[in-house]
Amino acid sequence: MGKIVGAFAASHSPGVTGWPERAEPRKREAIEGAFAEARRRIDALEPDAIIAISVEHFTNFNFGNLPAFAIATADSYLGPVTPEMSNFLRVEQHQYPGNGKLGRHIYEFAISNEFDPSLVEGGLDFDENFCVPFKHLDPESKYPLVPIIVNGVNPPWPTAKRSYEFGEMLRRAVEAQDAVERVVVVGTGGLSHWVGLPEAGQVNEEFDRDFITRIESGDPEQLKSYSPKEIDAAGNGAHEVRTWIAAAGAIGAPFEVLAYEPVPEWLTGTAVAAATPDLKL
């Protein structure tokens, strides 16, 4: 039987890799140190695959086709999507390995368990959503990925409750197969930030710290109770926290936030977190 052996979550601001030097040295060191610790823990868990949950910045989807959830089933993924984005993010363009069989299993399991995600069979190109965090978490791209997209960019969004339950479904899907034994989940996005708006560069530290308290509590209801209006107060980009909420549902355990820093130079409240099943309360 497969098992989710760990879950991680991290911000994916382009500034983390594209212009890290603009942040205050103390804040940069804290975030990069947290990424290094998360990478160490992932390697120690020896995963056979990583379920990577993020949002999609219109690299593949658009306003005319914007699913609440989407599951990709390719055996490789291009990222960053263009040479220009590669230069912007300071991430070398390359192919990330995928586990298409596990992705297909999760999709079919979801359909049989009251979820109706979109199926992406033809590949899914990456932008900062996966390229930024995985430059730190898996710089050699040695772990096969199952990319999953949660709509966190434009309403109507899936509810926080539905996002958490989607994560719980992922756990059951992994446990319902035995081809891949050890699976890690990584959610990326958030925390507070505004994209393409006059408020860009602001950070809602109050929201961020409240979110951290909730995700460290291990109490599902504290995460599932978020309303879109509450999240709106932290910026249109804050809706990406649904990826963290889904990761929390997948692991069913409290997270340890390894670092949090409000970094206006990166346009984001930036955090890295980790959880393992043995941390259950």
Language-model region placement:
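Active-site regions of metal-assisted phosphoester/phosphodiester hydrolases
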Residues: 160-167, 171, 179-184
